[in-house]
């Protein structure tokens, strides 16, 4: 069988995107006739959106907020066809243990945030407001890329640090920081990451998208049925720079809070919640229709077909 090659980008290199790494490692894509090669956008040399728009790639992981942003500016639509992460994968760290942490503890403090994407910041604003904290009373610094943000926190700048894995587990293990909150738990279920493509690819190659989504759903079912040790072992070849114990703990923390979607269906309720987060945070100004940014027709078929298999 001749495999259909696909290069799939992830916004940044992290085990947060384990469903992609696991799908490739377990052979689920190959069994659907796809030769999927994945890499981080930085290594590819283009952002996920840029690579899709200029035709360099056909499928990418990305936040739905990317398409909200494009639509809000009246630009070309990038539809999302399968949900991957149903919670934020970010965590809030402090310099010292804070067993009685309250969100009001951030008032007057500086949070060194994540600069590479706006969704973690927008979710933070929502969590603050929900807990009675005026976001203007908290200084959220989002100017530094990850390496510089990490160096700044280690150098004593800022009071809190918001980051994802593996940095979270690495800092907890070294004693440099202490976990005070999971943003995934604090924000609640939200379609944080999904697969996006172009309208033309959905129209011209629906069978390729179907095979890809069937592989995703098979991987999602596998992830739901295995423990952190098994998942970390499966994806380890894709993350050779992460020490095995750190990777297993990172996967375990993601898994315990149901970070990864159990199926590829991006539901309207999640879409509406994310839109509310982005509107109240000032990231978008208009209200957008679910049908304009999301196409679940192939995902729904993929679920039916996988579940019908013996």
Q: Model features per residue range: what roles?
A:
Residues 204-285:
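Secondary-structure end/capping motifs
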Residues 2-133, 140-143, 159-165, 176, ...:
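Short, glycine-/small- and polar/acidic-enriched structural segments
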Residues 278-310:
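Conserved C-terminal helix/tail region of periplasmic/extracytoplasmic solute-binding proteins
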Residues 21, 68-71, 125, 169-172, ...:
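Predominant activation on well-ordered alpha-helical scaffold segments within soluble catalytic domains
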């Amino acid at each position: 069988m001749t495999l259909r090659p696909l290069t799939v980008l992830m916004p940044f290199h992290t085990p947060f995107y384990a469903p992609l790494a696991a799908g490739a490692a377990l052979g689920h894509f190959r069994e659907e006739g796809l030769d999927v090669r994945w890499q981080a956008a930085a290594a590819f040399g283009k952002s996920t959106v840029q690579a899709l728009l200029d035709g360099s790639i056909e499928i990418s992981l990305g936040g739905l907020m990317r398409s909200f942003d494009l639509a809000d500016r009246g630009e070309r639509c990038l539809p999302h066809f399968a949900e991957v992460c149903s919670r934020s994968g970010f965590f809030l760290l402090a310099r010292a243990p804070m067993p009685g942490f309250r969100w009001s503890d951030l008032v007057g403090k500086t949070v060194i945030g994540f600069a590479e994407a706006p969704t973690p910041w927008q979710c933070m604003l929502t969590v603050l407001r929900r807990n009675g904290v005026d976001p203007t009373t908290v200084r959220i610094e989002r100017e530094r890329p990850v390496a510089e943000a990490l160096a700044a926190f280690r150098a004593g700048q800022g009071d809190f640090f918001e980051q994802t894995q593996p940095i979270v587990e690495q800092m907890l293990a070294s004693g440099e920081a202490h976990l005070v909150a999971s943003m995934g738990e604090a924000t609640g279920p939200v379609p944080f990451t999904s697969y996006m493509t172009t309208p033309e690819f959905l129209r011209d190659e629906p069978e390729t998208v179907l095979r890809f989504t069937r592989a995703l759903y098979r991987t999602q079912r596998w992830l739901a049925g295995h423990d952190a040790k098994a998942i970390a072992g499966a994806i380890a070849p894709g993350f050779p720079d992460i020490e095995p114990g750190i990777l297993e703990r990172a996967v375990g923390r993601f898994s315990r809070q149901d970070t990864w979607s159990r199926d590829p269906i991006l539901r309207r309720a999640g879409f509406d919640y994310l839109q509310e987060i982005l509107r109240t945070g000032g990231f978008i100004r208009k209200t957008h229709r679910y049908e304009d940014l999301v196409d679940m027709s192939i995902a729904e078929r993929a679920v039916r077909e996988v579940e019908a298999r013996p």
